[in-house]
């Protein structure tokens, strides 16, 4: 996902935080500690108040977005980025509904994950707790502010937000509404803050001790820059170079529908496919059926020699295989076998989401086991790689790293755990000497 503000400043030195930013971050952390003590009901009520305030400020938010769009058009922002920047009434109402739905999800906090008697009267439990304060750097996408803020409040975390500069007016209007809502709840409004300058977003990287996790949503270069310039843990949300492999044994109509949806349903999304891999035995029949469908959807196709021989008009370069288009462009390669498809995916994939279309169960299971991406699908669109569609309520990003959380990061990815041990004068020396023995008896959760 491109367009994140620091991506334009990757060669800049990281400045120290200003006194004003330090004060804001310190205040936010104090309020985040209070938020962590709020009850499930209080956090639910806070989300509903946020949704109400967004409804009340709907016209002001949409007007601010119009100003952002006009400025972006004058700057000739790419169509894919304009699509993300645009916040119409439907998108806004959907985001508001999403906040209300998030309030109804089970509480991710105070969940007992382990309950064990180490000995009589010495009881251990592991409880889910908030991370603390998260810093999220994201693209110029106003609806992301609402999703991330709501996830933060529901999971008991404070949030420092930085969107792409093209969305500054929209994000500021949205945050003002969210804070108005929080002011009518038990949660302090300053548990959320918005950074609007490049200098602030860079200085965020030096707020270790005040920020517990940074989630950058952007290019690999952005994620790498942040990892190299902060001591704060980083949860990388990088490029979405997703693949669809069409096996030789396949339901042709189904595969065409899945391919078109995976590319054209919303091409600016990171879970849209960028490369289509076709088994050589199915490629002629598939392309005969798919070329008109792609043309109707407005998709520009770029193919290797074999694909061009079957009707693809433009040639794909080596760079195409490694490109996240975020647009109605799709690269097509014809492969001799699934092994060749797996090799291509291993070389070029960003480990986001890969799909196989096949009717052969054994082939599907092998693909699902061999591909090391956050999401691996059979016979369905890559566009299902989404926190809302997974039933997470929303997502703060999609992690393409191997360590958890992986894939769409929802509420569960924004909590950690704490061990609590309750005793009655127990001392380690008694166990070291053999005077007492551990029982390690698991208790009901």
Swiss-Prot record:
The keyword Cell cycle does not apply. It is found in: Cytoplasm. InterPro entries: Ald_DH/histidinol_DH, Ald_DH_C, Ald_DH_N, Aldehyde_DH_dom, G-glutamylP_reductase_CS, Glu-5-SA_DH, GPR_dom. It catalyses: L-glutamate 5-semialdehyde + phosphate + NADP(+) = L-glutamyl 5-phosphate + NADPH + H(+). GO terms for biological process: L-proline biosynthetic process. The keyword NADP applies. Its EC number is 1.2.1.41. Its main location: cytoplasm. Keywords: Amino-acid biosynthesis, Cytoplasm, NADP, Oxidoreductase, Proline biosynthesis. Pathway: Amino-acid biosynthesis; L-proline biosynthesis; L-glutamate 5-semialdehyde from L-glutamate: step 2/2. Signal peptide: none annotated. One of its GO terms (molecular function) is NADP binding. HAMAP family: ProA. Catalyzes the NADPH-dependent reduction of L-glutamate 5-phosphate into L-glutamate 5-semialdehyde and phosphate. The product spontaneously undergoes cyclization to form 1-pyrroline-5-carboxylate. Belongs to the gamma-glutamyl phosphate reductase family. This is Gamma-glutamyl phosphate reductase. The lineage of its organism: Bacteria, Bacillati, Cyanobacteriota, Cyanophyceae, Synechococcales.
